[in-house]
């Protein structure tokens, strides 16, 4: 019986992280290579079955390309700044921050990432509103007038003082601002669209009101009408899932996250 040898093409990993993020781009290129991809920095117009694209955030031209590739069945991974500090990069399929898929394994990753919680706070004075920066994909970005509208809506449910903390990325230079920890001091609750400030609020034991349809910790947040009686749910499982979206540079270089994405 004659057998014909078939040479399958090597899958391509397209690294579209901008050159300005040289450390992150180099790590992702290495990780794609060590997980079995031929690495390219070109912008593809079509993907083969096992190809993958890694892009930094999903908005503007990246969103247009991601929409096109996914409509063809392509595999798109979104990278962005980590949610637990500068030592990590966040990775998720299709969308970031709870809007996409992460390679969650039912294993404890919290200890490795040294995530610790303070007990839930049972007192507090003010409501802290933390808007997002205002850009992103159609699915995830905060509505333009959200901050003004949410402050007005909060007045229907509480008489507490309401403070608005603008996103640090929108701060003007030479202005003095309190740290997030200082703004959270004596806070009763933190209100977000889907800002990362909510992650740190929950770690500090301060309940979160989330107004977006998608957020990485949506399962343990409350709706606005519960501002005076916010949920104080167990945080372990939600944060353990979040931890599987956070990868160190060394882990990314090893290729582990891309292998996990390729298996599902």
Give each language-model segment a name.
Residues 122-171:
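Conserved catalytic-core segment of nucleotide-activated headgroup transferases in glycan assembly
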Residues 1-52, 135-136, 259-264:
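N-terminal pre-catalytic "stem/leader" segment of glycosyltransferase-like enzymes
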Residues 16-21, 59-62, 134-138, 169-170, ...:
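Short acidic, S/G/P-rich loop/turn micro-motifs used as interaction or catalytic elements
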Residues 51-52, 126, 188-189:
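Structural motif
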Residues 25-27, 33-89:
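Extended catalytic core of nucleotide-activated donor transferases of GT-like folds
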Residues 88-125, 140-141, 218-264:
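Leloir-type glycosyltransferase catalytic cores
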Residues 40-47, 61, 65, 155, ...:
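Donor nucleotide-activated moiety binding/catalytic core segment of transferases
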Residues 5-14, 79-83, 125-136, 165-168, ...:
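Short loop/turn segments at strand-loop or loop-helix junctions that form parts
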């Amino acid at each position: 019986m004659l057998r014909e040898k078939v040479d399958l093409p090597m899958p391509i990993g397209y690294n579209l992280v901008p050159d300005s993020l040289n450390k992150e781009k180099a790590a992702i290129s290495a990780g794609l290579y060590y997980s079995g991809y031929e690495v390219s920095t070109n912008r593809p117009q079509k993907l083969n079955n096992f190809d993958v694209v890694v892009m930094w955030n999903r908005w503007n031209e990246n969103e247009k390309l991601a929409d096109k590739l996914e409509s063809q069945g392509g595999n798109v991974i979104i990278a962005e700044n980590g949610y637990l500090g500068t030592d990590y990069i966040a990775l998720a399929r299709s969308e970031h921050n709870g809007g996409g898929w992460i390679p969650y394994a039912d294993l404890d990753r919290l200890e490795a990432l040294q995530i610790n919680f303070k007990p839930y706070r049972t007192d507090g004075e003010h409501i802290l509103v933390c808007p997002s920066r205002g850009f992103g994909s159609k699915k995830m970005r905060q509505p333009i007038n959200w901050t003004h509208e949410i402050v007005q809506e909060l007045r229907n449910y509480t008489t507490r003082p309401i403070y608005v903390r603008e996103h640090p990325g929108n701060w003007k230079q030479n202005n003095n601002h309190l740290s997030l920890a200082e703004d959270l001091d004596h806070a009763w609750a933190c209100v977000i669209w889907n800002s990362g400030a909510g992650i740190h609020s929950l770690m500090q034991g301060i309940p979160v009101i989330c107004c977006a349809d998608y957020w990485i910790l949506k399962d343990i947040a409350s709706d606005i009408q519960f501002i005076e009686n916010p949920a104080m749910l167990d945080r372990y499982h939600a944060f353990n899932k979040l931890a599987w979206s956070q990868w160190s540079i060394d882990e990314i270089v090893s290729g582990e996250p891309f292998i996990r994405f390729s298996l599902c």
